Swiss-Prot record:
Ion transport keyword on record: yes
Chain residue ranges for the region called Disordered: 1-28, 611-630
Protein name: Betaine/ectoine transporter LcoP
Main location: membrane
Ranges of compositional bias, category Polar residues: 1-13
Swiss-Prot/TrEMBL keywords: Amino-acid transport, Cell membrane, Ion transport, Membrane, Sodium, Sodium transport, Stress response, Symport, Transmembrane, Transmembrane helix, Transport
GO MF annotation terms: symporter activity
Lineage, top ranks: Bacteria, Bacillati, Actinomycetota, Actinomycetes, Mycobacteriales
Cellular component terms per the entry's GO annotation: plasma membrane
InterPro entries (UniProt xref): BCCT_transptr
Role: Involved in the uptake of osmoprotectants. Can transport betaine and ectoine. Na(+) is probably the coupling ion.
Length: 630
């Protein structure tokens, strides 16, 4: 069918043979398919689980038995990686932002992350709150006061002099660069690709599923399993780094409250063990709702602590600093993104300690955060999803870092003890609160918040890894979930041990090494995502509409001058709206052929939602799945 100027086909012309489509539905008319409406058969992927588990257990055993050996090898590999592949980390962060901005403002922006009928499950406020909760953690406390202070005292190479008004704004811009759009652009890329793949294309929720447009059925073979194994390993190390930071920060709080002279690695390991017990209890006892409530309380306490510092700290100074730091961040963004080996050895050292670690950390967190964001974003348009996911959480974190960092820098300017650069990063937080009201209470609140972040992060990340090792099962076996949680704790311990006296060094080095290969996965994912969108039913309709109107207007002017109107009727072969588009190609139609649990084709009526063999989905409560578990 085509839109033309109104000319009928010659009576002598035979109609072309009707094309055959799955379920007699043109690819431009498919309303979308949700993974929930598919007849998937889940089970433990023994290859993904077995190989990944063996590698991780071997690494943990090596790290515990010979931490010096791990430290030596990782340091050597780290030096090589920073010299030769540091540019890759910068590049992938820009890819995330660029891809999502392109999608948001292109013709793909109107495509839904779901079927045509799907509406958002959550209000916009609740959606943003949950999204923000997924992307923040202990880092806002560990680095919030200390990072801006550090950059203020020792600015990045080739920028400004330290302890000056210029370094104040440079310090906050650098912190915003690390925690703002770059991180959330990458989360949006992975979350958007997963949500589209699962709720628009009906694929199982696996990282490998997002590559279907490029690799076809190979995503269900060795190539797909390799991608999922890399995603699990990245998540393990990224979350383990977070757990290690939590332990370090909690240890500092325990030291302050107890009056202990020093917190050793043995004490940090004991803290990890205690918090691990809390994670295991939450995983196996069915208190998931309680954990969610606790997580919501934690977010409220976090924002409350930020507001507390804003009110009791240098409020007027902070009000002036917020817009200044945001504008400085915007003006310096490309300059900061362009720093690499070409700027010299000092820049490489700065990148290794700060920027590269953050990029690696965010890359390693993308499977975890991306999968969570995907699950709560169903029914949103890609334009709304991309813009809000990148902008709102970034702005909230920018506010938090400006308030914490601006307060710490103010205390340095006022010569308050502990803010001259001599204190450790974990100590600066407690030093800041010690100079504000209610210090008899705030250390306990901070320890509680940090501990809950530990448990909830471990719990959520373990479920994600359980899903990835169970063929996309959204409710994986609890023993698998606990196993991955214990592996995270083991890696966190190894990271602390390999860091020696500076535990943070071990966390940073290993996180960067693991993230570099997964960065390549994310670049290819961006390409696959765009290719997927190019054959979306909505994109096909837009293509036909553009061709039909263009053809009809030209033909109308040629044959009727000013006096013509558009109508819909059969067009001559080769002159229709779809003349240059093969709507029957396998890569256009294969995805919406419905199958049963064994993968056999089954007819389906998209209008009525009925299967030809009479199958109907069982009525299940939230969190349950119609699946066969190993």
């Amino acid at each position: 069918m085509s839109t033309n100027s109104g000319n009928n086909l010659p009576e002598s012309q035979e109609s072309p043979e009707e094309p055959h489509y799955p379920h007699d539905t043109h690819p431009g008319l498919v309303p979308g398919i949700s993974v929930d409406a598919q007849r998937n058969k889940f089970g433990l992927d023994k290859t993904v689980f077995g190989v990944t588990a063996a590698l991780i257990l071997a690494f943990i055993a090596w790290g515990i038995s010979s931490p010096d050996s791990v430290s030596s090898v990782s340091s050597t590999m780290f030096s090589w990686a920073m010299t030769n592949t540091g540019w890759l980390l910068n590049f992938v962060m820009l890819i995330g932002i660029g891809t999502m901005l392109y999608i948001a403002f292109s013709r793909y922006g109107r495509i839904k992350l779901g079927t045509d009928e799907d509406e958002p499950e959550f209000s916009r406020f609740s959606w943003i709150a949950m999204m923000f909760g997924a992307g923040i953690g202990v880092g806002i406390f560990f680095f919030g006061p200390s990072e801006p202070l550090w950059h203020y005292l020792s600015p990045p190479p080739h920028t400004v002099e330290g302890s000056t008004p210029e370094s104040l704004h440079q310090a906050l811009a650098q912190s915003h660069f690390h925690w703002g759009l770059s991180a959330w652009g990458l989360y949006a890329l992975v979350g958007g690709a997963l949500a589209y793949s699962s709720y628009r294309r009906g694929r199982v929720t696996l990282i490998s599923s997002t590559f279907r447009s490029l690799f076809g059925e190979k995503t269900e073979g060795i190539a797909g399993r390799l991608i999922d194994m890399m995603a699990i390993i990245a998540t393990l190390f990224g979350t383990a780094a977070t757990l290690g930071l939590s332990a370090i920060q909690v240890g500092q709080g325990v030291q302050i409250i107890s009056g202990a002279s020093e917190i050793t690695n043995n004490i940090l390991i004991a803290i990890i063990a205690i918090l691990t017990i809390g994670f295991i209890i939450s995983s196996v006892s069915g208190v998931s709702k309680g954990i969610r409530y606790l997580s919501n309380l934690n977010i409220s306490l976090t924002l409350g602590l930020v507001l507390f510092v804003f009110i009791t700290g240098p409020t007027l100074f902070l009000l002036n600093l917020i817009p200044s730091s945001v504008l400085e961040y915007g003006s310096e963004f490309l300059s900061m993104a362009g720093k690499s080996l070409s700027w010299g050895e000092e820049t490489i050292e700065f990148q290794a300690g700060w920027t590269a670690f953050y990029w690696a950390w965010w890359i390693a967190w993308t499977p975890f955060v991306g999968m969570f964001i995907a699950r709560i974003s169903r029914g949103r348009t890609l334009r709304e999803f991309a813009l809000i996911t990148m902008a709102i959480p970034s702005f909230i974190l920018i506010l938090a870092f400006t308030i914490f960092g601006g307060t710490a820098i103010t205390m340095n300017r006022e010569n308050v003890d502990g803010f001259d650069g001599s204190s450790s990063k974990e100590q600066v937080l407690f030093d800041m609160f010690s100079n504000l009201p209610l210090y008899s209470i705030t250390p306990f609140i901070l320890i509680f918040v940090l501990a809950v972040f530990f448990v909830t992060s471990a719990d959520s990340a373990s479920v994600v890894m359980g899903t990835m090792s169970s063929q996309g099962n959204p409710a994986p076996n609890k023993l698998i979930v606990v196993f991955w949680g214990l592996c995270m704790m083991g890696i966190a311990v190894v990271m602390l041990l390999t860091g020696g006296e500076s535990a943070l060094t071990g966390l940073q080095n290993l996180t960067i090494l693991i993230a570099i290969p997964f960065a390549l996965v994310l670049i290819v994912m961006a390409i696959a995502f765009i290719k997927d969108l190019s054959t979306d039913p909505a994109a096909i309709r837009q293509r036909y509409a553009k061709a039909a109107i263009s053809n009809a207007v030209v033909r109308g002017l040629e044959e009727h001058g000013d006096d013509f109107e558009l109508s819909i009727e059969p067009a001559e072969e080769g002159r229709g709206a779809g003349a240059t588009f093969d709507s029957t190609a396998d890569h256009i139609t294969d995805w919406y052929q419905r199958t049963d649990e064994e993968g056999n084709d089954v007819d389906y009526d998209f209008t009525t939602g009925k299967w030809a063999d009479g199958w109907t989905p069982e009525s299940t409560e939230e969190g349950e799945v119609d699946a066969k578990k190993d």
